[in-house]
Structure formats: C-alpha cells, structure tokens
C-alpha cells in the first residue's frame, strides 16, 4: 500500500477481525470480513456494523451557513428544524450532480454535511468557492480525521441502542439526530443509513471509535465491509455517486427529482427548472434479469440489437435471490415490465424494468 | 490440507482421475477463498472438446469475473448441474460437491505438467 493511503481509527480493529483490506477512494478499507453475502444477510436479519469513517464530514457554521447550503444542496435546508437531517444532492449551475449527501442541523448556525469519500476534496473546494464568492459569513471545518463514523444497521439496532444509551431520545425517528452518551463518551447519533434497514450512524471522536465499535460487536452485530454495503444499498435502490450518477447527470435523469426544491433561489435553479419543463431523454431504471447472469457497471443495454442504454450497477441479490441492476435507458423503457437485453460480455441476457426499490423492509 | 489424490494447476484448478479413467475438474480452496462468494458459473456444454489450458467457462463472485481453464485435454462428458442453481457449493465444498466438469478421453500424460498437492502448497506459499 502506498504511504499516501489514509487509515481510519478502526484500521487495526479491522485487521484483528480478519478484514480483507482494499484501497477505496484513497483509504484502506475492509471489503469483507466473513463474506459479502453472509454479512448482507446478517444486516437484513439482525444487525451489522460498518466503518464509514472514510466519508467526508464537513461542518458548516455561521450566520450564512444555511444560506450557503441552500444555494447548492437540493433539499430545503433553511426549512429544517434543529435535530433533523435531510438527504439531498449538491448541484452545480449546470444542474449536474457534484455529490449526494446528508445535511444535519446540529445547533444554532451549525450544520454538518456528510459527503462521499471520493468527492470530499471536490465538495470542499466547491463549498469554499461559494463561501468566498457569496457567503463570506460562513466557517467551513473538515473534521473527517477527528471524528469517526460507524453505521449500525439492521432490525435489532434500535433495541440495542436503547439499551446502550438510556438517554437515546425515544423520539429519534428517521432523519433525526442527537447528541448522546455511550459509556461516558459523547456521540453524535442519527437515524440514517445506506442499507434499506432501520439503523443508526454514530459519530464519536475518532479516538473513541474502537471502543464504541467493540461495544456494538458485543451485542452480536456482525462486522461488515464495503462489499455488503454495496449489495445492501443496491437492493434498497440507493444510488452510488460516481457509479450511478455524476457531474454529467442531473437529478431528473437519476430519478431523484423528489429531492429537488425548485422554488428556492439556488445555483442550480435555472438549469433544473429548464430540465423539469423540457423533460429528459434517458432515465435511470431498476431492472431484474429474467435469465441467469450478473449485470455489471458499463455493460450495454440493447433492444432489437440497438443500443438503448447502459448498466451502472448490478449484482446478485441474496435477499431476493435474483440478479438485479440499475441503468440508464431511453425514457420509454423505464415503465415496469419493459423488456430489454443486457450484453454480458457478448452473451445477450434478457432483463425487465422494475420499480425501485428492489427491497423495502417491513415497517412496524 | 490439499488432498494428494489429485493434481493441481497454477491457475488453481484441481483434477482427479477416477477409476474409469475419466477426470473430475474443479477449482481449489485457495481459488474460492480469493474469489469470495460465487454467484454465477458458466460451464461448457457436454460434448465440448477442450485442449489443455483452454478457457472452459467463467465463474463470477460478487466483485469479479474470472475465467476457468481446463487443466487437461478432453471431452466434456458431464457438467455439475447443481452449480447452476447453487453456485455457493463452490465456496462451501470446492474439492467435492463443488466439482465443475467431468472429462472423458483425457490425455493422462499431461498430468505430469501439473503439480502434486505438496508442490501446489509450496506454490501457494510463494504467492504469499
């Protein structure tokens, strides 16, 4: 491994648990522990732990903090009440998706943006540019290295957290965040995740991460790597930036327009209002294979031997026991039931468009 | 740990000569461990003629696609149909239930070009 690779505070913990480490977005991260499919099943059935400390954590503070975020994040940030979080896209003046992430409203004039590891530098530069040009009364503070982040996901997670932290607010509903004590350590906790299960994301000080991780492991949570995280998010129909969308994709093509507030003044408003009124020619769809075969990023989608799209994500879903994928296709092929063919390294394999998500948990 | 009743290739296939002279072929425990969870296997049709080291199929794990090569020249007499529905057998039992093809009309002299169990284990040790 080159010396420029970053390690999270849990690196040694991963090695001791037999994690298979791989380079990812400049970090050495565990791809898997016991195995990708077993980890995926554990999260769906009980609970799993993910080190997501590689993700960017940028605090935005000051009188213009919400105005800056509102200028580029597609969700309505100034409309948030304290202790709530909102998913959104960071869009540019052309309406392209620079990144996606969650904005947490922590306290008066204090917000936290959690963004993708691969985009952390680009997001930082973009926010700094906005601060310098229009929102000078804002302080940006990248605390990725000082604060850890652990995702604790699965149907058992809520009961376990209530036991571990008596001061966990009973009202900590989805997309709420709060500061709690776990074994005397102050931890920022949010009811968010990237798996399609109920669960939490915990942000302790980096040097307390290993103790929190160990405490959660003792409750029976299974350590999970990036492999299971990717399977889980795909089953839940959650897009991955850089794979399923990028700066050349707009939220309408990505099927994420429900997260776009068009009415507010913003850097993207003019571009995306035009997209909204004109419509798009291609759009992301979910699909499942009608024959055996693993669709993968970059494979061509065909109909009547004509290229009509491209696969962006795909794989075997252990939860559904079928092969599923995401891809961009001509608009008319996004209707559920539409048939097309995926070219799997020369093998023409039948597929059918399906509505997203592929999997949604029972709520109760 | 590798059974010494068979020979191994440097591409991590094993071949077991059966009492009737036919050859059973699969991938090694090391190979399945490196691949991770296998989710799809494509095997040749019965009757296919294969030359030693020729590509005979593909195995896909969650993360990657790998080619399968035949360690011996021969004719595909049978493929393990159970793998089509249960590719995880390759992870669970690579040296037995996870066998892939049965070859007839093999050239037994080619076995000399393959590794014994102890030679294969030394080869793995060199890989680190």
Residue positions per predicted region:
Chain B
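A short beta-loop-beta micro-motif enriched in histidine and acidic residues
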Residues: 36-38, 62-65
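Short, conserved catalytic or interaction motifs in soluble domains
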Residues: 61, 81
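Basic, polyanion-binding surface patches
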Residues: 86
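Acidic, low-complexity mobile loops and tails
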Residues: 1-55, 93-128
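Histidine- and aromatic-rich ligand-binding microenvironments
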Residues: 67-71, 104
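Periplasm/extracytoplasmic soluble domains of Gram-negative envelope assemblies
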Residues: 21, 62-64, 72
